[in-house]
Swiss-Prot record:
Protein name according to UniProt: Chaperone protein DnaK
This protein's encoding gene: dnaK
Domain of life according to the entry: Bacteria
Keyword Mitochondrion among UniProt keywords: no
Keywords of the record: ATP-binding, Chaperone, Nucleotide-binding, Phosphoprotein, Stress response
Start-end of Basic and acidic residues biased regions: 491-510
Length: 614
């Protein structure tokens, strides 16, 4: 059995962690960083880039670089690359595959299982899609865990067995959650959770982009939003400025050659953004965090004085305005001993350990973030499971028909808090037919909701009279069938083989270039010691390598390198022989000097002996 890891699949960055000796370790990626940008790019040569390498080339490959795809997961969004449509699951799977690969390189073992985290306020379709992304990446997804719960698990287990109430304020790159949890004696229980799936650091970045666009338009009369490359450069500069403003009072944004004017003259952008101005243009975003915060306190039925610890999660909580607001709302200083970028992945690794039996005496009790119900007469939302119900859970309720002799019922499943069903999120629908003819109100239809530990919903309907039953595992328009998942897994595996082959080919080319260069350099440095015919042969072999490198035939390159290697061995042999001959000539010269009558042999006199003679 392979190893299990914990993965924080983030909007802007992702992290992977593993249990070693009972302790969670965050794994550095192949570039040496502990966080991996959640960016995927399709290079023009067919290579798929993931992480920092994808982020680095975004400006020159805007249309084929995908970032923040987590904001689309669970929807029917697709992107068309080379006449092929990619779903958010497939793009997310690329990031997961890189994390898996980097973990395997670190561990020296296969990674087969994973606990993947999601925002607490993710609805069913988003959770299902995240699980599918894991499957496409070749992972057995042990559990989908809420990010604040994972963070509290990592934080709480370090605090021992004393009971405590923890408020987790999680502001990531694309989503926001706030959760209240009770931890004690190995039990982590979520009391309430709320959030906003469309609020995160990306929105703060966008405000800086908008500010820069307005400034540039006012000064230069040019709208930068019409230039995709310029917008990408603005995005990258905005993110850097936001980070800089967390520790400085101002940030200078200088982008030379950002675009050209109508006469093709280059234009430059140079602006200074103060922290005060930044907070002013993003104040409404900050205010949006207050409603979920107040909702959680209300739902949990607690006063703020009963909260023992406040934990900040997500890189966006590093903004001073965010931590100041949290302190203002809670009356407590947020805990500084937690790395907001890594704590979620650490908690996920601990949960993986719990599920694999490697961590004992820990129980995680999560909740469903939104109410679940069905549409009943008049379009009313009839809730079967209220929000903040501990999962896994199962609930049944009996309904009846609205018309005489109604042969079937349509079960429409919704998720949300609004009173009318149409105002909530439709998760799916199915039909229960074969109902025995009867006056309205007589048939008894039992509807059962079942939520598993991943927060994924199944619904069944049963006619009590006939025993006829129908079940649906919620899978809306964005859901993938098992056949589609299997196809995507094979596609991902094929790409992995292609990528491996491409890497090997590039390594062969690099080695060939290096061998040719080093051989020529060696000949130049030792030219006077090497025979002309050998130099000619080696030069021809090196030329053959250079010629092969111009083509795409990897076997031809390998063959040319092999031939050059054989000829190069003769270089070493010839140089050795030349040095030996030179040494012999020097020895002969020394011998001649020994027989010269003009050379006087010196007598060595021991100083002590000389003194004795005196």
């Amino acid at each position: 059995m392979g190893r299990a890891v914990g993965i924080d699949l983030g909007t802007t960055n992702s992290v992977v962690s593993v249990l070693e000796g009972g302790e969670a370790t965050v794994i550095a990626n192949s570039e040496g960083s502990r966080t991996t940008p959640s960016v995927v790019a399709f290079a023009k040569n067919g290579e798929i880039l993931v992480g920092q390498s994808a982020k680095n080339q975004a400006v020159t490959n805007v249309d084929r670089t995908i970032r923040s795809v987590k904001r689309h997961i669970g929807t029917d969004w697709t992107i068309d690359i080379d006449d092929k449509k990619y779903t958010p699951q497939e793009i997310s799977a690329r990031t997961l595959m890189k994390l898996k690969r980097d973990a395997e390189a670190y561990l020296g073992e296969d990674v087969t299982d994973a606990v993947i985290t999601v925002p607490a306020y993710f609805e069913d379709s988003q959770r299902q899609a995240t699980k599918e992304a894991g499957q496409i990446a070749g992972l057995n997804v042990l559990r989908i865990v809420n990010e604040p719960t994972a963070a509290a698990l990592a934080y709480g287990l370090e605090k021992g067995e004393q009971e405590q109430t923890i408020l987790v304020f999680d502001l990531g790159g694309g989503t926001f959650d706030v959760s209240l949890l009770e931890i004690g004696d190995g039990v982590v229980e979520v009391m309430a959770t709320a959030g906003d799936n469309a609020l995160g650091g990306d929105d703060w970045d966008q405000r800086i982009v908008d500010w820069l666009v307005d400034k540039f338009k006012a000064s230069q009369g040019v709208d930068l939003t019409k230039d995709k490359r310029a917008v990408q450069r603005l995005r990258e500069a905005a993110e850097k400025a936001k980070i800089e403003l967390s520790s400085s009072q101002s940030a200078n944004i200088n982008l030379p050659y950002i675009t050209v004017d109508s006469e093709k003259n280059p234009l430059f952008l140079d602006e200074t953004l103060s922290r005060t101005e930044f907070q002013k243009i993003t104040q409404d975003l900050l205010d949006r965090t207050k409603t979920p915060f107040n909702q959680v306190i209300k739902d949990a039925g607690l006063s703020l004085s009963e909260v023992d610890h406040v934990v900040l999660v997500g890189g966006s909580t590093r903004m001073p305005a965010v931590s100041d607001l949290v302190k203002e709302m809670t009356g407590k200083d947020p805990n500084k001993g937690v790395n907001p970028d890594e704590v979620v992945a650490v908690g996920a690794a601990l949960q993986a350990g719990v599920l694999r039996g490697e961590v004992k005496d820990v129980l995680l009790l999560d909740v469903t973030p939104l109410s679940l119900g069905i549409e009943t007469k008049g379009g009313v939302m009839t809730k079967l499971i209220e929000r903040n119900t501990t999962i896994p859970t199962k609930k049944s309720e009996t309904f009846t028909t609205a018309d005489d002799n109604q042969p079937s019922v349509q079960i429409q499943v919704y998720q949300g808090e609004r009173e009318m069903a149409s105002a909530n999120k439709l998760l799916g629908s199915f039909e229960l037919g074969g109902i025995a003819p009867a006056p309205r109100g007589v048939p008894q239809i039992e509807v059962t909701f079942d939520i598993d530990a991943n927060g994924i919903v199944s619904v069944s309907a049963k006619d009590k009279a006939t025993g006829k039953e129908n079940t649906i595992k919620i899978q809306d328009g964005s859901g993938l069938s098992q056949e589609e998942i299997d196809r995507m897994v094979k596609d991902a595996e094929a790409h992995a083989e292609e990528d491996k082959k491409r890497r090997e080919e590039q390594e062969t080319r690099n080695q060939a270039e290096s061998t040719s260069y080093q051989t020529r350099k060696f000949m130049d440095e030792n030219s006077d010691k090497l025979p002309e015919d050998l130099k000619t042969r080696v030069t021809e072999a090196a030329d053959a390598v250079d010629e092969a490198l111009k083509g795409d035939d990897i076997e031809a390159i390998k063959s040319a390198v092999e031939k050059l290697g054989t000829e190069s061995q003769e270089l070493g042999k010839a140089l050795y022989e030349a040095q030996a001959a030179e040494a012999g000539a020097e020895g002969a010269a020394a011998g001649e000097a020994a027989g010269d009558p003009n050379v006087v042999d010196a007598e060595v006199v021991d100083e002590d002996d000389e003194n004795k003679e005196k």
